[in-house]
Amino acid sequence: MQLAMDKAARYGVGCVGVKNSHHYGTVAYYTQMAVKRNMIGFSTTNATPLMPPPGGAAKMVGNNPISFAIPGGDYPPVVLDMACSAVAHGKIQLAARKGQDIPLGWATDNEGNPTTDAQKAMTGFLCPVGAHKGFGLAVIMDLLTGPLLGGHCGGEITGLTGCYERPQGCGHFFMALDISKFTPLEKFREAMNSYIQYIKSCPTTNENVTIYMPGEIEYDLREKRLREGIPLPESIINDLAQLCRESGIDPHGLV
């Protein structure tokens, strides 16, 4: 993203691709880098196949997350960070660790039957968000981060763990837009303030509902975690403590 931003500062738009890579973490981490330079950031990555096409019974495409981040004027940045599946795979993993059920529509079992059992979902398929629409988005992201870059896509990408003879093979795409090359920054800032106020002025279905912009809930949660710490289920604490012991690190404070 740094290179994409440098290009955008010169030309207005900067695009950079990475091939033959690995899992690159949270997509919004990269797009929010652009916000700090008064730019709009976009990024996507492909991933190990986790979803079938509509009507399919095999994993063919990853959930290929995408993110946009846009400076929010006087408000927090507007950040979209979403997988092309109905939910990120990590949420199913966490539910399985906690022994919790998952909502219907998140995933299927290994035969393609809808399930609320997180353990069965771990060996099944993720459901695309919006059915064929989410699948279509995932395919486009696969093509942006695979063939366009001369890299891998689909079943050519290995699992996150278990194969260490070569890189996982993921591709990443980064784009930055320098706002000042399109419109004066102050004018953009005022427009963002007005737009966010407009969205938040929407009447609600009841008095307990709050209108949020994309990324605002996560922004508030991050601030809370910085103040109060990160709660972890006991199973994860025990796993971390065991890793500490195996690595010769004192787990004091974890248990």
Region roles according to the model:
Residues 1-78:
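A glycine-rich, acidic short-motif signal
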Residues 2-5, 32-35, 69, 105, ...:
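Predominant activation on well-ordered alpha-helical scaffold segments within soluble catalytic domains
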Residues 14-19, 128, 174-180:
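Short glycine-rich or small-residue beta-strand-to-loop segments that form or flank ligand, phosphate
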Residues 38-50, 144-160:
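Glycine-rich phosphate/pyrophosphate-binding loops
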Residues 51-119:
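Phosphate/diphosphate-binding glycine-rich loops and adjacent basic-rich segments that engage nucleotide
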Residues 84-87, 133, 179-181:
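Glycine-rich beta-alpha junction loops
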Residues 89-150, 162-167:
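Small-residue-enriched flexible segments
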Residues 148, 153-255:
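Catalytic-core signal marking the mid-to-C-terminal active-site face
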